Amino acid sequence: MEAPPPSSDPYKFLNITLNSDGSLTRHRDFPKLPPTEQSKDIPLNQTNNTFIRIFKPRNIPPESKLPILVYFHGGGFILYSAASAPFHESCTKMADRLQTIILSVEYRLAPEHRLPAAYEDAVEAILWLRDQARGPINGGDCDTWLKDGVDFSKCYVMGSSSGGNIVYNVALRVVDTDLSPVKIQGLIMNQAFFGGVEPSDSESRLKDDKICPLPATHLLWSLCLPDGVDRDHVYSNPIKSSGPQEKDKMGRFPSTLINGYGGDPLVDRQRHVAEMLKGRGVHVETRFDKDGFHACELFDGNKAKALYETVEAFMKSCSSTGPSSNSNM
């Protein structure tokens, strides 16, 4: 007898149980790692138990002013943490490879905290960074790792999977906010998690994918979206559901990098988002690798290296040209 496809029981596939009170029991998780000499945790909102894990490169040239990368981890909005081993290790490597200070954000998870909770936490992290930058100007204080060693005018916002979705949605929320002296030079959406009621071609073709089977992604959306809405909600399907206000705001996004892989069921959604942003006048760079699967950079060192190289080149191009002329960020 053949083994059932990975999508036959999405709860079992995701190793979760939905409890009667609406909370989740998460049966298996990545181990959580404590901060190291090159990282530390800063409380963000103690009521919400959110924090920022800051990573710095091992070898920082003297008198250098490093760029800042705000990072949002993946996990379908319901799993994992900024302290989860794969994301901690990835941020450690990125800080070294990119010579960048990385702020990895611990945001609230669904279904205990449905969207837009994660977006609100993301905005709070961006505003925290702004307040840190303004501290010395206003006679206040600034975190010691940020005070003298960063260039607040070279900030990037990056996320993977659900974190990529957060990047898009936090950009909508802060595009009209005065963040000075912080300047967001670019957005980086890596394998961003978007959806819709009607399956895309890649979702249909890869419906039994071993990483993102279609029934599992449907379950993720049912657990994270606001009660009573479907997958065409604007949080998951901005192409179908964005109104005039969202379209106007996305037209003021800074330069944006969208990265994806041909073996990811979500890849068509990512392509569609890229085209949507281009249609609003955003400078969009895309890298879609024929090979690879969802989250492959967490398991394949060569894919991780290629991703870091792509991100590094994008950051350098943003720094040399400056932010998009249509961006207020």
UniProtKB/Swiss-Prot annotation:
The active site is at 161, 264, 294. Keywords: Hydrolase, Serine esterase. Expressed in leaves, stems, flowers and siliques. Its EC number is 3.1.1.1. InterPro entries: AB_hydrolase_3, AB_hydrolase_fold, Carboxylest/Gibb_receptor, Lipase_GDXG_HIS_AS. The keyword Hydrolase applies. One of its GO terms (molecular function) is carboxylesterase activity. PROSITE patterns: LIPASE_GDXG_HIS. Pfam families: Abhydrolase_3. A motif (Involved in the stabilization of the negatively charged intermediate by the formation of the oxyanion hole) lies at residues 73-75. It comes from the Eukaryota. Carboxylesterase acting on esters with varying acyl chain length. This is Probable carboxylesterase 8. It comes from Arabidopsis thaliana.
